[in-house]
A protein has these predicted regions:
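A short beta-loop-alpha structural element at the N-terminal edge
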Residues: 8-20
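Conserved GNAT-fold acetyl-CoA-binding loop/helix
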Residues: 22-47
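A short helix-loop-beta-strand connector motif used in the catalytic cores of GNAT acetyltransferases and
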Residues: 47-59, 86
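Conserved beta-strand in the GNAT
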Residues: 59, 65-74
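A conserved beta-turn-beta hairpin within the catalytic core of GNAT-like acetyltransferases
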Residues: 65, 76-87, 97, 144-145
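Conserved acetyl-CoA pyrophosphate-binding loop and the N-cap/start of the following alpha-helix
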Residues: 96, 100-108
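Conserved active-site alpha-helix within GNAT-family acetyltransferase domains
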Residues: 103, 127-145, 151
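Conserved GNAT acetyl-CoA-binding A-motif
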Residues: 113-125
Length: 164
């Protein structure tokens, strides 16, 4: 008889940082705009954990093992007149993909946004990645006429935590 699968989605904790950074390294290894750098990924996650008003990271555990995560950042939209979210990262470990875990994480994030009265969730996908775009469309996301642009700000102090 097969072991019953125990799947839980819950807020990540600082004890999860190492595993989360490994998931992000795996994600960024496949993205054109970013390079994997475990120290940067750890620093970014710590910045979220130190101020819960900045965002949330949820993990999906299968039988106690983290197999996926979703990272949501909070901001304000003057266009919408309220709080909105940026879905920064959604990643499922390669060995557990195509088993519905990404769907569960995204549905959890959407439910969280609704319960907390966020007005919108925005995300970016790779342009040629039609699989990811189809995945998000299936969950109600629509294309935007907005085109993302970036300006990389180089700093003298690579380890600077804040520029306030």
């Amino acid at each position: 008889m097969a072991e019953k699968e125990n799947v839980v989605i819950e807020p990540a904790t600082e004890a999860d940082l190492d595993e989360l950074s490994e998931l992000l390294v795996e994600l960024f290894a496949h993205e054109g705009d970013f390079r994997p750098d475990k120290n940067k990924q750890l620093r970014g996650l710590r910045l979220i954990f130190e101020q819960p008003s900045r965002g949330r990271v949820f993990v999906l555990r299968r039988n106690g093992v983290i197999v996926g995560m979703i990272n949501l950042l909070f901001t304000i939209s003057t266009a919408e007149g309220g709080f909105v979210m940026l879905l920064e990262d959604l990643v499922v470990h390669s060995q557990y993909q195509n088993q519905g875990y990404g769907n569960r994480l995204l549905e959890h994030a959407i439910d969280f946004a609704k319960k907390k009265n966020f007005l919108r969730i925005t995300l970016l996908t790779d342009r040629p990645e039609n699989v990811a775009q189809a995945f998000f469309r299936k969950h109600g996301f629509i294309d935007s006429s907005m085109i993302p642009m970036r300006l990389w700000i180089s700093t003298q102090n690579e380890g600077a935590e804040s520029k306030e």
